[in-house]
Amino acid sequence: MHRYRSHTCAALRKSDVGSTVRISGWVHRVRDHGGVLFIDLRDHYGITQVVADPDSPAFQMAETVRGEWVIRIDGLVKARTEDTVNKTMATGEIELYAQEIEVLSAAKELPLPVFGEPDYPEDVRLKYRFLDLRRETLHRNIVKRTQVISAMRREMGNVGFTEYTTPILTASSPEGARDFLVPSRIHPGTFYALPQAPQQYKQLLMVAGFDRYFQIAPCFRDEDPRADRLPGEFYQLDLEMSFVTQEDVWNTMGPLMTSIFEEFAEGKPVTKEWPRIPYDEAIRKYGSDKPDLRNPIVMQAVTEHFAGSGFKVFAGMIASNPKVEIWAIPAKTGGSRAFCDRMNAWAQSTGQPGLGYIFWRKEGDKLEGAGPLAKNIGEERTDAIRTQLGLDDGDACFFVAGDPAKFYKFAGEARTKAGEELNLVDRDRFELCWIVDFPFFEWSEEDKKVDFAHNPFSMPQGGLDALQNQDPLTIKAFQYDAVCNGFEIASGSIRNQSPETMVAAFEKVGLSQQDVEDRFGGLYRAFQYGAPPHGGAAFGIDRIVMLLVGAKNLREISLFPMNQQAQDLLMGAPSPAAPTQLRELSIRPIPPVKKD
């Protein structure tokens, strides 16, 4: 028999009854039932119930073991009685009668429990992450993450992609987030950077003729901590394709990601045909470029119904500024004054003046609008709004007014709040879509100039002609995001592979041809030697896994994450370097300036 085990703790079945076996694992818990000891032994695969009765030669040792000790048990497999069968366990029809127990490793008193969902401070859990990872939910999440990545590799191979790895030590990139820098010992005073993404390398692979590339790529960004992103590093399914339009990318990756979601969705419905929603339409209907389509609320403009109306606040805004619009947020089943007042109070708590509203109720056979706005604009306009929005008895509608460029985010938050408060959101499904036709440029209020709205390497729609002859703020890009349940899970574009068009695009944001050559020299040079039309995307693995397992926090799907202060409490990073290391790197730390 093997030194440590003949079976795992999830392997034994009724067919093994009568066999003498050996298992090893962690003591999950010990229970004393009338002098008979029951030990739940746990390993990576599952749990087996072990019985040590007073007549067993192993009983004396069984009395000494404690939770999370690592032990080996030899014993006889017996069938459980019918009334003790546990159908929730894979091994629930048997139990192992211990004949010999060996302690392989004792455990000190635990700083936190390893079963259930402990409400322990996050820093304690991260410091003792090796214990936290023993929890069933977290352990299962990590295994699921690995399975999802394996499925991604399989599916990408099935549609003709090949995995290539790109360098981890690379040049610092001036665009995007702050780089993590790595000093060079051989070239004092110079630095490598950890890649924020393999963007330029994957495009160079297309120029080199590799056609369909992918990798499970680690990405590093020195960003301030955010709730929806792990500090330091994250992983993405990175891909690039040659001789493609954006429709080719959508038609390849939409079905592929649907199959991934269906494989791990545990029966929840998954969108098969992803809608393609233009960016402007997404902002107009949902107040967000990453809409949660499980929420059925669709906003509409109702400006005409308030123009010249008796509600002087809205009517005056419309008359004085052509940019002003009134957006309606329909809320089916929200037609009670209590709910409307609750939404109004919520709006005020976010710093807004409030939310105007109308709700409808039947008075006898007549359907009437109620609330201050209904009284001010009159019955005819109120009914016209109700008809346009398809509302009825017991429904409500909220209104946001002003320049949509300034209020759309709040309108989107109000849509989300109403949908959640009224339980309109079906949480047991995965709604996926493409957001397309992003603006190529945007106006930077901070710098008072035109800047890139998203990816500067995207191809502008209309190409060089658009850059030379259009208002830059009207130019769209061949750029797209994939969205699931209100989360951006991917971003991609058709790339700008023309040197002339590339320079023209950067000139719009104030960079010269020399700046382009200095900052993106490798890519710029490559495009002068025959670059195929190409495009791709990057899918966020961490976020996809978080959605699939229903985790609320990215730390629940990551092995050894940092805390919100970007510290690895388990390994003690970051930490000061030894003086000899700093001398080798020609570096002298400068203490930060203390703020008064």
UniProtKB/Swiss-Prot annotation:
Residues given in the record as L-aspartate binding sites: 175, 221, 454, 495
SUPFAM superfamilies: Class II aaRS and biotin synthetases, GAD domain-like, Nucleic acid-binding proteins
MF GO annotations: aspartate-tRNA ligase activity; aspartate-tRNA(Asn) ligase activity; ATP binding; nucleic acid binding
Enzyme Commission number: 6.1.1.23
Site features described as Important for tRNA non-discrimination, chain residue numbers: 33
InterPro entries: Aa-tRNA-synt_II (IPR004364), aa-tRNA-synth_II (IPR006195), aa-tRNA-synth_II/BPL/LPL (IPR045864), Asp-tRNA-ligase_1 (IPR004524), Asp-tRNA-ligase_1_N (IPR047089), Asp/Asn-tRNA-synth_IIb (IPR002312), AspRS_core (IPR047090), GAD-like_sf (IPR004115)
Functional note: Aspartyl-tRNA synthetase with relaxed tRNA specificity since it is able to aspartylate not only its cognate tRNA(Asp) but also tRNA(Asn). Reaction proceeds in two steps: L-aspartate is first activated by ATP to form Asp-AMP and then transferred to the acceptor end of tRNA(Asp/Asn).
Quaternary structure annotation from Swiss-Prot or TrEMBL: Homodimer.
Protein name in UniProt: Aspartate--tRNA(Asp/Asn) ligase
